[in-house]
Amino acid sequence: MEYQIMKADMAQDDEKHYLGHVTFTLAGHQSQYEITLFSKNGKEWDYSLNFAGDSGIEEEFLKADELLEEDDDLFDALVDAAMDSMEQ
């Protein structure tokens, strides 16, 4: 699935846990999404998906969430974009 990353950020807290956000679009979807990423060690990630801005079409949101679960390349690209923002 084609995607475009609009913005990304990542930070570490005092306990060295990672917390990041990536705003992105998916081809054929009307809305932008924001994924919030959390990891205690930078290897295993929990996430929460939301619409970025106004709510959109629920069916598209559910497809986006399913895609994140199934498409490791997409998920890894979003994590990488957030991690790369720390290095700048």
Feature locations, PLM:
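Negatively charged, low-complexity tracts enriched in Asp/Glu with abundant Ser/Thr
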Residues: M1-T25
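Acidic, low-complexity intrinsically disordered segments
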Residues: T36-Q88
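Beta-strand elements of well-folded, non-transmembrane domains
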Residues: D9, L26-Q30, S39-N41
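Short beta-strand segments
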Residues: Q4, S31-I35
